[in-house]
Amino acid sequence: GQGAYICGEETALIASIEGRRAEVDVRPPFPVVEGLYKKPTVVNNVESLAAVAAIFKLGSEAYKTIGNGRSLGTKLISLDGYFNNPGLYEVDLGTPISFIIDEIGGGFNDDIKALQIGGPLGGIVPVDILKTLTLDFEAFSEGGFLLGHASFVCIPKSFSAVEYAKHLFAFTAHESCGKCFPCRLGSVRGKEMLESAIEGKQKFSEELIYDLLETMEVGSLCAL
């Protein structure tokens, strides 16, 4: 995969290990039934495997006390340069986002309008929601966001939201494996639509963008 974003999806990762093009496979069969070289395969990320050592050391009952009762354990987070204390931290799942921003990150060093949490295709969370949001999978799912790998990327007020959305479409177009045409074509079309709006060639249509996003999500295999 040579660092391809799509290899964050388990079947694409398996394809890459086998020497095939890094593309998503249809499921079922799932990797636990038929995975690497057609053998049953368990795919976990490094963070999950690292938690296994803590569970063996502390015991499962003690480990269950870490977190908020819904999401258990800890989560690595990374804070970008718009925080006064940027860096990599480990926090309990269920920690309030406001605590992460103010106490761990030391607040922002610029006027921020939103945070993108969870990677290049993670959720974009407006600042007015951050005060009530907690760092756990359930809270993010209920809010319509993805927690992902919990990177915190700040979007300053001075940066155009449309320009930022264009950047995300461009990233998707570059990283698409190309197997599903809604993603392969939709990402390019989304980038073109936003470019035209920025350049004043056509009016920005929120409805068209949402229709395109829904088509890409429903019509693709991985919906990354």
Predicted segments, located by residue:
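Hydrophobic alpha-helical positions that pack around
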Residues: 1-93, 105-107
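Flexible, glycine/charged-enriched surface loops at secondary-structure junctions
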Residues: 62-70, 74, 109-118, 179-182, ...
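Short, structural beta-strand-to-alpha-helix junction motif
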Residues: 92-100
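Intrinsic disorder at enzyme termini
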Residues: 28-32, 36-51, 56, 111, ...
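Conserved structural-core and active-site-/substrate-pathway-adjacent residues in large, well-folded domains
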Residues: 8, 100-101, 180, 222
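Short, surface-exposed loop/turn segments at secondary-structure boundaries that line and modulate
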Residues: 2-6, 12, 117, 121-126, ...
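Terminal amphipathic helices with adjacent charged low-complexity linkers/tails
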Residues: 108-143
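Ferredoxin-type iron-sulfur electron-transfer modules in oxidoreductases and energy-metabolism complexes
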Residues: 133-224
